[in-house]
Amino acid sequence: MTSPESSSAAGSGDRAVAAAAERAKLTAGRNIPSFDDLPLPADTANLREGADLSDALLALLPLVGVWRGEGEGRGHDGDYRFGQQIVVSHDGGDYLNWEARSWRLNETGDYQERGLRETGFWRFVRDPDDPSESQAIELLLAHSAGYVELFYGRPRTQSSWELVTDALARSRSGVLVGGAKRLYGIVEGGDLAYVEERVDADGGLVPHLSARLSRFAG
């Protein structure tokens, strides 16, 4: 006999699947714009279009798409809310393109000012001499605040990934920041959620950013 709890859980799961199917009707036909006069494969954020995803990236397949939503941040001036768009695309190569743009929101949830912005690439480590590294991930990022960062990590599950800063370099005009730890995951309803902690002036990891983003394209 099915318990009320399991029936409720099953119903919740069914609703989540139905909601995801409805969203897919909208997102499946969307992609990022591209120029069609270049001689190489175009970037695509939709796995239904463009070049096939490299076999080397199959463990990152759920990330591909355009994601939009809101999150919470903690800065020198206190806590704040932000909107964000993340674009994860590929051109058939052995890397994913990554671009994240955010903007601060005011108390009514409207745009207030530009926020953090970063661009870079996800890659898998290839080391024939060390098979244990075959699932290691590199995330190379350039931040608009004036620093570049290399994250290193591994998949935790088929739909979650954990990374920590391995190296960080600041430009002469860049902000002072510490290393970070990030956890990304596909959560209920197919959303992309993440949390980031950064090292503060006392040398400890403290909450910095968190967000939950819904698929907009792909």
From Swiss-Prot:
Catalytic activity as recorded in UniProt: peroxynitrite = nitrate
Pathway it works in: Nitrogen metabolism
UniProt enzyme class: isomerase
Required cofactor names: heme b
EC number: 5.99.-.-
Domain of life: Bacteria
CDD domains assigned to the protein according to its UniProt record, in alphabetical order: lipocalin_heme-bd-THAP4-like
InterPro entries in the record: Calycin, Nb(III)_bact/plant, Nitrobindin, THAP4-like_heme-bd
GO molecular function, one term: heme binding
Family per similarity comment: Belongs to the nitrobindin family.
Function of the molecule: Heme-binding protein able to scavenge peroxynitrite and to protect free L-tyrosine against peroxynitrite-mediated nitration, by acting as a peroxynitrite isomerase that converts peroxynitrite to nitrate. Therefore, this protein likely plays a role in peroxynitrite sensing and in the detoxification of reactive nitrogen and oxygen species (RNS and ROS, respectively). Is able to bind nitric oxide (NO) in vitro, but may act as a sensor of peroxynitrite levels in vivo.
Quaternary structure and partners: Homodimer.
Entry domain remark: Forms a 10-stranded antiparallel beta-barrel structure able to accommodate a hydrophobic ligand in its interior. In fact, this fold hosts the heme group, which is located in a wide surface cleft.
HAMAP family with a match to the protein in the record: nitrobindin
Name listed for the protein in its UniProt record: Peroxynitrite isomerase 1
Source species of the chain: Mycobacterium avium (strain 104)
